Structure formats: C-alpha cells, structure tokens
C-alpha cells in the first residue's frame, strides 16, 4: 500500500484546515471590530441626537410667555337701524370669536372625529396617531394622514405663525419638536375645552375666514350654533386644505371629504345611521352658492360707497384725535 501518498494527502488536509481556521478567526475578528464600530456609531449618533433635541427644546418659548388667543378680529359696520351692512377684515383678522357653548356638539365632533380622534385622551401629542400616520405613509407612499393634535395646531396657528415661511427641513423639524414639547406643557395648564374653543376660533376655513363663526356666516349666512350636521361636515372638511376643499370654488372636492367626515362621526357614535343618511341627501352646496351670490351682489351695492366713507371718517378721527399713524388707524379699523 502507498502510505507516502496518504500521508501527503492528510498533511494537505491538515494544512487546508489550519488555513480555514486562520481565515475564520480573521473574519470573526473583523466582524467584532465592525460590530464595535457600529455600536459606537449608534451611541455617538444617539448622544448627538439627544443633544440636538435638548438644544431645540431649550430654545422653545416658555409656556408662561406664550398666548394662544389671537388679538385681531373682524369689524362689523351697521346702519342707523342697527342693520349689519358690511364686515371689515384684514389679513389674519376675519374671525368672530364665540365661546364653546355656542358651538353645537355635532360641529365639535365633526372636527375631533377626523382631525384628532383621541383629543380627550392624549396629553398634547398622540403617539398612536404618529405611529398610524407613519404606517400609512410607508405602506401607501402617500403621507396624507396627519398626526398633529388639535393642541399642536393651536400652537402652530397662534405661536409658530411663521411656519408657512419655513424653507428647509431643519427649520420645519425644529418647529415640530418645539410644537410637540409646548403641546404637552400647554395641556398641563390649560383645559381641553379651552384648547378646543381656541382651535375652533382660529383655524383657516377658506374664503378669507378664520374660525367656525366667520365661516358659518360666510357659507351659510347663519350663526355657528344653528348649523346642521350636514353643514358642520362641510366646514370641518375645509381645514385640511382650505383652497382645495373650498365649498364655493371646489364643491366636489369638499363633498368627498365631507362624506369621510360623516362616516367618521357615525363610526364614533356621534351621529345615528339615520342622521348620516339624511346628511348625505342634503343639497347643501346649492345653498352655499345662493349665499355666495347674495354676498357678491351686496358687495357691489350702494352700501359699499357708504362704508368707504365711514372708514375714511373713522381713520381720520383716529389720526387727528388719538394721534394714530395711518397704519395704526388702518389696523384698528380692520382688525376689530
């Protein structure tokens, strides 16, 4: 038998085995170094992230120094018979403030059931809502589901008022973090009802209206407390995108959103199945067009000349008697 050949083969196998062990140990060593560096990187990024968040929160305004109540409101002009003939507004002032008890329950729930269904449960930020919005965005590749609570929207509309001018992701990210932080702080010192009241008085509802009372009068020529379920759903539909869901300019878009809001209200048990069906059958948009036609007709009436004269006289008196500048007089007249 050829033992020399077998010994050579065995030695070659042993050599290959040793080489494999060396390579294996080297790979394990490289893997350990890689994992160590990865953990170190994660820890470093984590600390940097915490430092960034701490800096952003530290630079946020104090909850004691902010005001969520808007100062400007619309000015109403009456004739000698105490009949309203015009409403004067400037940018950010076309609102008519009302208390929460003047808002019908179905109007409150029209907003809550769609914009912030856990409003009475969360502490200012809705972690479940954030998770749901993230899941929908990832699965549909369409980040259309909002995660901002009503409290955050109140802060955005009344404290972080320059959010529309944000030109970078970092600016938006910073504002969002401060918004969430202040939302939690605000709910520690402010009741849910007060936050809801402020929200309903400050949201942009299209056609140069702010708040549900101004919107109710603009679209339906009635006070908010007299709105029907169908009409409430129309107004609540606007807030997600005031231009796109404007019931005068884009009634079809608004109708689609309105149907979703009515479904949410029914699912939450805030309207019955019968009320839901009745609301869907309501020819609400024809009424809106009639009101709009009347408003446009009145804006071209002789009253407009009378109103212009009243404005000029009041502004002149404010400047001559009160010592106002032209700008101060203008703001006083048009901002309530």
Question: Where in this protein do the model-derived segments appear?
Answer:
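Peptidoglycan glycan-strand catalytic modules in the bacterial/periplasmic cell-wall system
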Residues: 2-9, 78-272, 294, 326, ...
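Active-site oxyanion-binding pockets that recognize sulfate/phosphate
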Residues: 37, 248-251, 335
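Periplasmic POTRA and POTRA-like interaction domains that precede
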Residues: 69-70, 77-80, 222-227, 301-313
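An N-terminal domain-start capping segment
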Residues: 30-34, 55-59, 109, 272, ...
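Hydrophobic faces of stable alpha-helices that mediate helix-helix packing
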Residues: 25, 29, 45-46, 174-177, ...
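Non-catalytic structural connector segments
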Residues: 273-336
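N-terminal type II signal-anchor transmembrane helix
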Residues: 2-80, 85
């Amino acid at each position: 038998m050829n033992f020399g050949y077998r010994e050579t083969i065995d030695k070659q196998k042993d050599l290959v085995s040793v080489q494999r062990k060396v390579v294996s140990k080297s790979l394990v060593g490289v893997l350990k170094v890689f994992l160590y560096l990865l953990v170190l990187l994660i820890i470093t990024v984590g600390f940097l992230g915490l430092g960034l968040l701490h800096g952003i929160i530290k630079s946020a305004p104090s909850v004691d120094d902010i005001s969520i109540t808007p100062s400007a409101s619309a000015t109403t002009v009456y004739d000698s018979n105490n009949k309203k003939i015009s409403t004067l507004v400037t940018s950010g002032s076309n609102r008519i403030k009302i208390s929460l008890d003047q808002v019908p329950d179905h109007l409150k729930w029209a907003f809550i059931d769609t914009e912030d269904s856990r409003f009475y449960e969360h502490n200012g930020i809705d972690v479940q809502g954030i998770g749901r919005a993230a899941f929908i965005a990832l699965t549909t590749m369409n980040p259309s589901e909002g995660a901002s609570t009503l409290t955050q929207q109140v802060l955005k509309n009344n404290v972080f008022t320059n959010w529309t001018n944000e030109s970078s992701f970092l600016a938006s990210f910073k504002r969002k973090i401060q918004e969430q932080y202040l939302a939690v702080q605000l709910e520690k010192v402010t009741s849910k009802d007060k936050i809801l009241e402020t929200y309903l008085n400050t949201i942009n509802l299209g056609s140069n209206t702010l708040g549900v009372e101004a919107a109710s009068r603009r679209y339906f020529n009635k006070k908010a407390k007299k709105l029907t379920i169908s009409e409430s759903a129309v107004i609540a539909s606007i807030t997600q995108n005031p231009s796109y869901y404007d019931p005068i300019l884009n009634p079809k878009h608004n109708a689609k959103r309105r149907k979703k809001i009515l479904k949410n209200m029914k699912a939450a048990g805030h309207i019955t199945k019968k009320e839901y069906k009745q609301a869907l059958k309501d020819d609400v948009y024809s009424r809106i067009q009639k009101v709009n036609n009347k408003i446009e007709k009145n804006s071209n009436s002789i009253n407009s000349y009378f109103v212009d004269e009243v404005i000029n006289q009041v502004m002149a008196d404010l400047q001559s008697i009160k010592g106002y500048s032209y700008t101060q007089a203008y703001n006083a007249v048009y901002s309530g």
